[in-house]
């Protein structure tokens, strides 16, 4: 206590509502927040430095562990940066499957956000429902990659393997049902007086402040800024898809909640469009200097075996240069800045994680709010400490 009025407390790093090992030093006047100082680094693993001692292929699994709730979005951003340096084109089938999986990833990330955000405020039913739907997406991950979370599925030039025959039906059935599930969530929350009291007018940040800080993703669009990399700076074939970019009007927690629900509906539409575009074809580029040979060749010819061994043991050289690639991850703009010195390992990799930047808005959003409202504000930012600390 200072002057018997201002109290300084710690929230976290082990607190269920900080969504990871986030510590916040909070100054309070009674229950009113005066200042918040986020303290990060408890989950630092040195991903950027580790990449300098691994080949481009060996670096890919590290990206799974940034935002571990959206591994394929991480994979996509990294692979697009590598492919840009290599100058190779991805086959249409592989590109379409990438779109399907990154939009399913967006859905499952938003489902985890909704489940935890609702649970923080006391709506346990939505938590159970959202994790029920997420389980289907986790099963789809396992179906195509063998892993439920850290998928390591994308490759430079395409995918590690083609999807099985049952993939298309499973995804089509899920996205047909998903809008009805979203209706259920809205029926439980949107008109609920407790939910509205806890979210409307809470965590307000203006479009100007959000832009100045560098917020991206649903947190930015909730403040009324109409910006989405998929539409405005399209990549991976997104220019071929029709979808709406929702924005808020009141710049508060409730608007950010509504933006994410609409995004979930739009992701279902994108997946349906992608399924219609999904045609037979190769899932790896014709780039033998980068891509592994087919398994038949590896098992039945010495040339194929040597080819596989060379790429696995030495990696593939990437032309000298530097590139930045940003993608619209579920939480905002995820960027990879790669510098190549012509070898098979990155000279430097810099990750621009959306959660790290979005977290900088916490003081602006929470200043003057009640301590009890901080839980809702943290939830609406949808941060993951894996990508903040890296």
Curated annotation (Swiss-Prot):
Protein name per the record: NADH-quinone oxidoreductase subunit D
Domain of life: Bacteria
Subcellular location: Cell inner membrane
InterPro entries named among the record's database cross-references: NADH_Q_OxRdtase_suD, NADH_UbQ_OxRdtase_49kDa_CS, NDH1_su_D/H, NiFe-Hase_large
Family according to the record: Belongs to the complex I 49 kDa subunit family.
Single GO MF annotation: NAD binding
Chief localisation class: membrane
GO cellular component: plasma membrane
Gene name per UniProt: nuoD
Catalytically driven reaction(s): a quinone + NADH + 5 H(+)(in) = a quinol + NAD(+) + 4 H(+)(out)
Membrane topology field: Peripheral membrane protein
EC number: 7.1.1.-
Function: NDH-1 shuttles electrons from NADH, via FMN and iron-sulfur (Fe-S) centers, to quinones in the respiratory chain. The immediate electron acceptor for the enzyme in this species is believed to be ubiquinone. Couples the redox reaction to proton translocation (for every two electrons transferred, four hydrogen ions are translocated across the cytoplasmic membrane), and thus conserves the redox energy in a proton gradient.
Oligomeric form and interacting partners: NDH-1 is composed of 14 different subunits. Subunits NuoB, C, D, E, F, and G constitute the peripheral sector of the complex.
Keywords in alphabetical order: Cell inner membrane, Cell membrane, Membrane, NAD, Quinone, Translocase, Transport, Ubiquinone
């Amino acid at each position: 206590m200072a002057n018997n009025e201002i109290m300084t407390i710690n929230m976290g790093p082990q607190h269920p509502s900080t969504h990871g090992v986030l510590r916040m030093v909070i100054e309070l006047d009674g229950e009113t927040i005066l200042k918040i100082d986020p303290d990060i680094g408890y989950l630092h693993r040195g991903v950027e430095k580790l990449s300098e001692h691994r080949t481009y292929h060996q670096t890919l699994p590290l990206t799974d562990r940034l935002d571990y709730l959206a591994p394929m979005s991480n994979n996509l951003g990294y692979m697009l940066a590598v492919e840009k340096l290599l100058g190779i084109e991805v086959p249409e089938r592989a590109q379409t499957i990438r779109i399907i999986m990154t939009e399913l990833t967006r859905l499952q990330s938003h489902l985890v956000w909704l489940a935890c955000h609702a649970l923080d405020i006391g709506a346990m039913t939505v938590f159970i429902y959202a994790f029920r739907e997420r389980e289907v997406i986790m099963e789809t991950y396992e179906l195509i990659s063998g892993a439920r979370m850290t998928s390591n599925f994308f490759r430079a030039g395409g995918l590690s393997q083609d999807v099985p025959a049952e993939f298309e039906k499973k995804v089509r059935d899920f996205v047909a049902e998903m809008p009805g599930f979203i209706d259920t969530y809205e029926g439980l929350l949107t008109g609920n007086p407790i939910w509205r009291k806890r979210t409307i007018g809470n965590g307000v940040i203006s479009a100007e402040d959000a832009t100045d800080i560098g917020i991206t993703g649903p947190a930015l669009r909730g403040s009324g800024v109409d910006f989405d990399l998929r539409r405005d700076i399209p990549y991976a074939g997104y220019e071929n898809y029709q979808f709406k970019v929702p924005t808020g009007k009141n710049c508060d927690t409730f608007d950010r909640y509504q933006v994410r629900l609409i995004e979930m509906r739009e992701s279902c539409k994108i997946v349906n469009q992608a399924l219609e575009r999904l045609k037979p074809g190769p899932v790896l580029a014709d780039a033998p200097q980068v891509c592994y040979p087919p398994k038949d060749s590896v098992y039945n010819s010495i040339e194929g075996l040597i080819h596989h061994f060379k790429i696995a043991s030495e990696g593939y050289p990437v032309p000298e240069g530097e590139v930045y690639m940003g993608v619209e991850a579920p939480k905002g703009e995820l960027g990879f800045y790669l510098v190549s010195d012509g070898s098979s390992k990155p000279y430097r990799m810099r990750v621009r994680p959306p959660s790290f930047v979005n977290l900088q808005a916490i003081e602006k959003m929470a200043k003057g709010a009640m301590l009890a409202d901080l839980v809702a504000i943290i939830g609406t930012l949808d941060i993951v400490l894996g990508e903040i600390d890296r």
